[in-house]
């Protein structure tokens, strides 16, 4: 009893120490000492602040459109928006600065604890090995440096271990469907938290984890449970998925996919990015791309620990038998997929460019993220199978944890600090206005031009809505990185204001008329043009004046949807309610049994 208490105490202490150092190292980026956060927060922080206004005015009603960006555009249908998500709840409660810190902390805990539970309860490794694996995942660069850069849509990646844990437990406890319901909700969360752009990477990562679990347990029936979970989760999020697909179909885009020059370049980049530190110059020189990438894009670090563990591989892994051959085949599949998508060996990129969804993604090296969890699981497997006494295993884990912490403590993060260019102050000031109960309304469209008359380069394009104007030159990748698919010429400006830096702000009132149309896009035309008798990029007509006034005041307005979207709306809400009621029912049963027992 005392021995078990001491071990649990040691695990909790070590667990807390690892988490403390993680937060100590990375909370300094939220914000940095100049009050800035990562550049892509420019997109997502305004999204979350819009969600705050929408909730105040409309509670849980679907935010189909937003007047805050692009002079009116679809919001719910954007795969990267996240109104029904954990992060939106956090930003509803706290001010932007505190919310950003809490958000990073909560995601860290979910990823950390989820991995510990997955390795401990799912893969049945001991406490210390599970803790090391959890630590490796906590510090992985794909999570940490995407959070710093503001790639908020990618951060739901951290829920993969927790999802896999729920799925495995639901399979092992076949009569208990609580974990299946939890896994389905978590699967739906991948869509609703804005992870649409990397949903294939997330699902492939899940497949790899479950494939390794099936191999170790010599039982592949869990894939039926994965099918059930993903189907229920897809039903819950079917409204979001359907709307996103309709939006994307109206604005198809295909950019040339990134491609490594050779297998050697891919392997070298992988090795440096995962185990040492990325080489930005080498990466960009060996990659064919539309433009060079920042250091944050090549950060996947799981530390040098997995490399060290190679020297501890047990001889039994080299025995030629069916079990090991199957394991090698699984590893080959895991290794091959990112290589296949990054190096055009067989001219397969032509085929990939014709595959729906896959052809809309072009930054293919992000597929390296699917390596993270297999590397961590195999690292744990190596230690778990060491033929040494448990005490020595504990000491080995402590040494490896120390290496993990030291490597992250001494790492030069200067580039990431200097790359943070988005000021959070506008959002903080806007949040104060909301607290004071000041009603919000968009006055009209606006754009800022520099002295040469071209759109001014800015790190806070979407912030304009904090000042009651909707930016025409917004940050919305669906319209193209240069907004080439947005009919910007339909918006004209009647007023001009010279700013302090001699740039000029051109703006109009939304009710200014031109040829029977107002100066604001009708967002329903971007999403359901046929049903609303218009074309993508059409503006509100003078007959739609009441709709425009409601829309610009963050109120719902009437528009038509196609039949399939209406069906998926009902499917989503009923699936969610059934799942939620099932969990609530079992929660009350659980409470009742506790009270009855004591």
Where does each model-flagged region fall?
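Membrane-interface junctions at the ends of membrane-embedded or membrane-associated helices
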Residues: 1-5, 121-125, 168-180, 212-225, ...
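Membrane-interface helix-loop junctions at the exits of transmembrane helices
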Residues: 20-29, 54-59, 90-94, 128-150, ...
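Start-transfer (signal-anchor) and selected internal transmembrane alpha helices
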Residues: 1-27, 225, 321, 567-598
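Membrane-interface coil-to-helix junctions
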Residues: 17-112, 135-147, 151-157, 263-287, ...
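Membrane-embedded helix bundles of polyisoprenyl
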Residues: 15-20, 109-122, 128-172, 176-214, ...
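Periplasmic/ER-lumenal interhelical loops and adjacent helix-loop junctions
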Residues: 46-50, 56, 236-314, 438-439, ...
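Hydrophobic alpha-helical membrane-interfacial segments at the cytosolic entry of transmembrane helices
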Residues: 9-17, 219-245, 257-265, 326-335, ...
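Hydrophobic, aromatic-rich transmembrane alpha-helices
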Residues: 211, 235, 302-339, 555, ...
């Amino acid at each position: 009893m005392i021995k078990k208490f001491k071990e649990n105490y040691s695990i909790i202490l070590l667990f807390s120490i690892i988490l403390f150092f993680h937060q100590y190292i990375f909370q300094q980026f939220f914000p940095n000492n100049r009050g800035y956060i990562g550049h892509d927060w420019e997109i997502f922080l305004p999204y979350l602040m819009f969600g705050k206004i929408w909730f105040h005015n409309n509670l849980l009603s679907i935010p189909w459109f937003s007047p805050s960006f692009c002079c009116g555009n679809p919001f719910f249908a954007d795969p990267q928006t996240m109104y029904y998500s954990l992060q939106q709840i956090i930003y509803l409660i706290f001010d932007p600065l505190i919310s950003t810190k809490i958000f990073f902390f909560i995601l860290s805990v979910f990823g950390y604890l989820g991995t510990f539970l997955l390795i401990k309860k799912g893969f049945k490794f001991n406490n210390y090995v599970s803790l090391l694996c959890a630590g490796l995942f906590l510090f992985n660069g794909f999570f940490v440096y995407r959070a710093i850069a503001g790639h908020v849509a990618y951060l739901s990646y951290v829920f993969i271990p927790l999802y896999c844990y729920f799925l495995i437990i639901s399979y092992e406890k076949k009569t208990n469907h609580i974990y299946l319901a939890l896994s389905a909700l978590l699967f739906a969360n991948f869509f609703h938290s804005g992870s649409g752009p990397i949903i294939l990477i997330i699902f492939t990562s899940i497949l790899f984890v479950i494939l390794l679990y099936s191999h170790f347990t010599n039982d592949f029936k869990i894939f039926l449970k994965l099918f059930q979970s993903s189907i229920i989760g897809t039903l819950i999020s079917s409204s979001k998925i359907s709307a996103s697909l309709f939006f994307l179909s109206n604005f198809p885009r295909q950019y040339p996919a990134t491609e490594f020059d050779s297998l050697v370049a891919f392997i070298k980049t992988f090795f440096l990015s995962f185990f040492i530190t990325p080489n930005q110059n080498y990466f960009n020189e060996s990659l064919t791309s539309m433009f060079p990438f920042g250091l944050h894009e090549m950060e996947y670090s799981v530390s040098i620990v997995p490399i060290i563990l190679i020297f501890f591989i047990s001889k039994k892994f080299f025995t030629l038998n069916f079990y090991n051959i199957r394991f090698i085949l699984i590893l080959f599949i895991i290794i091959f997929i990112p290589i296949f998508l990054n190096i055009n060996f067989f001219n397969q990129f032509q085929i990939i460019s014709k595959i729906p969804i896959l052809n809309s993604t072009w930054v293919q090296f992000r597929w390296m993220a699917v390596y993270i969890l297999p590397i961590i699981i195999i690292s744990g497997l190596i230690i778990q199978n060491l033929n040494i006494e448990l005490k020595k295993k504990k000491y080995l884990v402590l040494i490896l944890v120390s290496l993990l912490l030291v490597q992250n403590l001494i790492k030069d993060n200067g580039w990431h600090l200097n790359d943070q260019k988005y000021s959070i102050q506008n959002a903080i000031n806007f949040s104060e206005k909301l607290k004071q109960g000041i009603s919000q309304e968009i006055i009209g469209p606006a754009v800022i031009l520099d002295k040469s008359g071209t759109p001014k380069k800015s790190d806070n394009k979407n912030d304009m809505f904090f000042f009651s104007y909707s930016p025409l030159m917004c940050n919305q990748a669906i319209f193209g990185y240069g907004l080439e698919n947005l009919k910007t010429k339909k918006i004209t400006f009647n007023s001009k204001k010279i700013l302090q830096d001699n740039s000029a702000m051109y703006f109009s009132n939304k009710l200014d008329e031109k040829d029977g149309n107002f100066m604001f896009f009708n967002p329903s035309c971007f999403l359901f043009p046929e049903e609303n008798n218009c074309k993508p990029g059409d503006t509100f007509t003078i007959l739609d004046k009441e709709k425009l006034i409601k829309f610009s005041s963050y109120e719902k307005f009437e528009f038509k949807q196609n039949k399939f979207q209406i069906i998926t709306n009902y499917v989503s809400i009923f699936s969610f309610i059934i799942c939620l009621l099932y969990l609530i029912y079992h929660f009350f049963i659980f409470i009742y049994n506790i009270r009855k027992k004591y």
